[in-house]
Structure formats: C-alpha cells, structure tokens
Amino acid sequence: MNKKRIFLLLASIFMCLQLVSCSNGEKMQDGYYTAELSEYNNGWKEYVTICVMEDQIVSVEYNAKNASGFIKSWDMAYMRTMNTIQGTYPNKYTRTYASQLMENQNTDNIDMVSGASSSGGNFIRLADAVIEKAKNGDTTIAVVEVEE
C-alpha cells in the first residue's frame, strides 16, 4: 500500500514539474518576425525584424522608414545633424540596440544609448513584441502602439 502511495505521489510531482517547465520555457519558432509602431513619429515609423533559427535570434534589423519607404539610417543629412546635436545617429544606435538583442537573446539588459533613449524605449517594446510572435510562431506583423 505504501509503494502505491509513493508511486502516485512521485507521478503527481513529475506531472506538475512537466506543466511548469512547458509554461515557462516557451521556445521561439523558426522564421522571420516583424513589429512596427502604429504611427509615424516625426515622419518615421520604427520597426524591428528578427530571424529565428533553432530557438535563437540569428539576425536583427532595427530601423525606421518614412511614408515612401526610405530608410532613416540612409538619410545622410539627418545623420550629420543628429550626430552634431546628440552625439549619435540612426545607423549607429540601431546597430547598437540590435547587437545587444542578438547577444542577450532578450530585452532584459538592453543599455540605452545616450541621445537615442526614446528610440531605445521603442526598440525594447518592438523587440518584446517580435519575441512574443516568435514564441507563438505567428508571422503576422505586430503593431505596437506609440507611447504618448
């Protein structure tokens, strides 16, 4: 009789552990996932696209585009102006944020870039959205509301 109780107790514990491990360890599904802001801000709409392979983020693109599709980090005049005033520019800070996501595989330890902290906040929200999409295997574009 005691062996039966011990077996049932161990089986119950094992089943509980399985349920906990399944709910906490969501794996990302292979594919490309994109999130973009819901609106343009100063003429630009920021977006993040990641590529996931074997539960790892293997590439990250973070940028912004205008209504005609022109990419912000390609705007040399904007770069010169921003670099003079802020000490950084889109092609620099977008790569910094993207490389931090690649290294950490999450947004927990993303360091803000001086002069681009607003974009850093947007990046974290966009990256969290694409990671959630990757966990669900949902390749539709996530739309993230612009913070006021």
What are these regions (language model features)?
Residues M1-L10:
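Bacterial N-terminal signal peptides that target proteins for export
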Residues L8, S23-E26:
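Short, surface-exposed loop and linker segments with low hydrophobicity and enrichment for Pro/Ser/Thr
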Residues I13-F14:
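Repetitive helical segments and hydrophobic/amphipathic motifs
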Residues L17-S21:
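C-terminal motif of bacterial Sec signal peptides marking the signal peptidase cleavage site
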Residues G25-E148:
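Active-site- and interface-proximal helix/loop "cap" or "latch" segments in soluble metabolic
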